[in-house]
Amino acid sequence: MVPQVLLFAPLLVFPLCFGKFPIYTIPDKLGPWSPIDLHHLSCPNNLVVEDEGCTNLSGFSYMELKVGYISAIKVNGFTCTGVVTEAETYTNFVGYVTTTFKRKHFRPTPDACRAAYNWKMAGDPRYEESLHNPYPDYHWLRTVKTTKESLVIISPSVTDLDPYDKSLHSRVFPGGNCSGITVSSTYCSTNHDYTIWMPENLRLGTSCDIFTHSRGKRASKGDKTCGFVDERGLYKSLKGACKLKLCGVLGLRLMDGTWVAMQTSDETKWCPPGQLVNLHDFRSDEIEHLVEEELVKKREECLDALESIMTTKSVSFRRLSHLRKLVPGFGKAYTIFNKTLMEADAHYKSVQTWNEIIPSKGCLRVGERCHPHVNGVFFNGIILGSDGHVLIPEMQSSLLQQHMELLESSVIPLMHPLADPSTVFKDGDEVEDFVEVHLPDVHKQVSGVDLGLPKWGKYVLMIAGALIALMLIIFLMTCCRRVNRPESTQSNLGGTGRNVSVPSQSGKVISSWESYKSGGETRL
């Protein structure tokens, strides 16, 4: 039921046709950009493809294939062979009777075969009695023939039912197949001219036990049905579907290869010959569950990003990437141009390889051409790097770290405070903070020097400067006092002429610096 979709997508249905979930979705059609405010942002519902505006969901029941359905459905049946037993008796002169038995076939009738089968299954003794040889009749000196018709039932005889045309396949049929069973003709001819094959159940359709009833949500717009959310929570689009009968039941073959029987008012073409449906097994159901879980996880991440935007009242290119539609269909695209939040209607398509949307350096393909950027900004968090490469947040490459750094540094406030009821304005005619955010920093215009210190750092620097200045003043005052000492003091000190003895390393006593110097030079 899923080669590999969605749609999810896309999704599934989209290439949520399974086995290969799209690595990315990008608009193939992008409407004009219009400015919006922060509270206009919203997370897309990736579990429903907003296809052509069909967002009205209503509960309904539909029929799909059972898990374990296989292309060759086993149908139990039986063969019925008509046998005529002939007993020929001859009675001679003395009364001896000679009996000779002979058998031959006849073409049985379906009604008689059905009755014989019912006798056999019910253990009715009439079936066993019907197989006995006829009780011979005799007449003196005459030959008498007695015949008895019997129906030999052999069961089970298993055949394969083709669900597409309800034909039966078995080696017991001429050419290996039988397509003659209808309401009025409930048997098949076999390789034996006097043997017919019949299904155990008179209604062959009940042998085609491959359907199950499920509950889902129909996505519609007015009388038009665009798709539905199946029982596992995955959206399936009816775009491109065609009518196909399985076991005589009319249904729709979807683009992802699944089959459903549901009522729609739209005219749908018949599928071309040879159009088959995919196997519905536990693996396909598990893939659908995994895709749904991934889409739910991505929606939670989007809601977290949206909550962060509303809390901080700011948005970044990286956060905008969470708001991208993850499955093909109609949605929104967001971007930031010249510090203005912009929105555009978009129709998303799935991307399987990055080369599809980045064919060359600096080119982001949208539709059939390279999409222009505005100051290095595209949309949905896609930007142009400093080296000219297109940077996509979800792209796993060596540029991812560089991309993350660029995106994280691009956080700017976008929600106008006039739209925020929690904004508190200043008294008087003082400039409001939200205005200053959009103006150049006047401090940087006054001085090109910026120490980068916080407020407390500035105070520490001022205190340290004051202490250094105080120490310098004390040092200067001390020097001035020494200079202003009386000359008498200096003369008295000079006339004293005291000798200072300093012990040398050799143990001798040196009386003055001059003696120490001359002695040291002598030793050297």
Swiss-Prot record:
Residues 20-459 are virion surface. Disulfide bonds join 43-302, 54-226, 80-113, 178-188, 208-247, 242-271, 363-370. It is a single-pass type I membrane protein. Pfam families: PH_Rhabdo_glycop, Rhabdo_glycop_CD, Rhabdo_glycop_FD. Changing residue 14 to S: In strain: HEP-Flury 2003. GO terms for biological process: entry receptor-mediated virion attachment to host cell; fusion of virus membrane with host endosome membrane. A lipid is attached at residue 480 (S-palmitoyl cysteine). Keywords: Disulfide bond, Glycoprotein, Lipoprotein, Membrane, Palmitate, Signal, Transmembrane, Transmembrane helix, Viral envelope protein, Virion. The keyword ATP-binding does not apply. Homotrimer. Interacts with matrix protein. Interacts with host TRFC. Interacts with host BST2; this interaction inhibits viral budding by tethering new virions to the cell surface. Interacts with ITGB1. Interacts with host GRM2. Attaches the virus to host cellular receptor, inducing endocytosis of the virion by using different host proteins including TFRC, GRM2 and ITGB1. In the endosome, the acidic pH induces conformational changes in the glycoprotein trimer, which trigger fusion between virus and cell membrane. There is convincing in vitro evidence that the muscular form of the nicotinic acetylcholine receptor (nAChR), the neuronal cell adhesion molecule (NCAM), and the p75 neurotrophin receptor (p75NTR) bind glycoprotein and thereby facilitate rabies virus entry into cells. This is Glycoprotein. It comes from Rabies virus (strain HEP-Flury) (RABV).
